[in-house]
Amino acid sequence: NNLEDFVQETDICITHGHVDHLFFIPEILEQADATVFATRAVMNTLEGWVEDTGCLVEVEPGYSWRQGNMRITVLKGKHTSFCAKTVFRKLLNPRLLRYFRNALFLAWAHPRFPEKGETAAYQIEAEGKRILLLGSMELDPDTVYPENADLLILPYQGKENMAEAAMEIVERLKPARILLDHFDDAFPPVSEEVDTRPFKKAMDERHPEIKVVKPKAGKPVTL
């Protein structure tokens, strides 16, 4: 996507404060008349980067607002953590040398763009339909999430056994459809292009009634 794809938006919902979610927000706000909704950790980061902080709205779980015919409600989320095996695999991967400059940038950015345990999920309701957007492939164990959402937007990155982790979320939430995101290699060498086929195969075998959609960059998805 290009920045031009976002300048017409009026509301921007941030799930958490990592650099891959925030880095272009100041530039978008320079071109767009938009309001950013996010938790206190994100506000703390953006207030040091954004000139006009009047467009920033702090939210917390339970906060709800209307945007046109949509109602958006904030839920508590949880960010996935790399296990030791994943950390060692990435450190020993030749990609670390190939993307060494990226690695230096990410090492610089990580402490400046903290998540601080404040990952949010968003429930979006419109026209009798309900969408649940997760910020990471993890659920807060103490939060009651809406089951049977018409669409679950599921970040597919950050676990050693992605298909198994995703299936656990599906079993808990029981969505009607799933739209995968975050499976691309956006910030190498920390990220990687994730093979979504094992999850699709598992879903076809165990939940053939639930359609799984893997979007392509630049192509709209009709829901």
Explain the meaning of each model-derived region.
Residues 1-18, 23-30, 48, 81-108, ...:
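Pre-active-site segment of Zn-dependent metallo-hydrolases
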Residues 7-8, 30, 51, 68-70, ...:
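Structured loop/turn residues at beta-strand edges in well-structured enzyme cores
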Residues 18-23, 43-46, 63-65, 81-82, ...:
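Active-site environment of divalent metal-dependent phosphoester hydrolases
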Residues 9-18, 37-40, 132-136, 152-157, ...:
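Active-site neighborhood of phospho(di)ester-bond hydrolases with catalytic His/Asp-centered motifs
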Residues 107-171:
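Active-site-proximal loop/helix segments of hydrolase catalytic cores
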